[in-house]
Structures are given as C-alpha cells and as structure tokens.
C-alpha cells in the first residue's frame, strides 16, 4: 500500500500557498476532512547521497493535482520566492486509522521547475 502524503507550503511573499487546497472547491470529490489546508501529494521523490565528501541533497520532486495552489506555485517560481514546505507522511495503524509517522521539512526552498502533464 502506498503512503499518503500531504504538503503544506508557506511563501515568503504570498503567505499560505496551501490554504484551502484540500477543500471540495479546490479538488472536487478528492477532498479529505481535516486536511483542508494541505495539498494531497500523489508521489514524492527524495534523493540524498553521500560521495565520501559529505551528503548531497538533490531536491524533492512531487506530483499533485491542478488545484488553487497551481497559479500560486507559478507566481512563486516566477518571483524566485523562498518557501517553507512540510511533507507529512501518513499510514494506516493497527486500528485502521491514519497516523502521521514521518515528516520532511524544507526551509528556504525554491521551486526549480513546474511540469503540467495531461494523460489521455
């Protein structure tokens, strides 16, 4: 079973980019109660390696819906805005409920690319 990941984003200039992204107005029938101000992340790729000279962080790539944060992310990349990003990882516990078990926090992050892909 795959992980469930929610993203919260705050921009230095725009403020809360993820505010309202988990609502039915933003995502339609994909909204989840309790996650109204978070962005549902379909996939996440995190690459860190050690070459013997220290650790190197190669960024995080994530996939999300087109929602109300999409134009704000475009503004962010256009203005080279610093971002605070938090990725919350959830799993199903032994009682059948979601529990947060892992967190990745990025401070002073910048977007380097945005790709829109529509698959038929």
Residues covered by each model-derived region:
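Glycine-rich, low-complexity intrinsically disordered segments
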Residues: 1-120
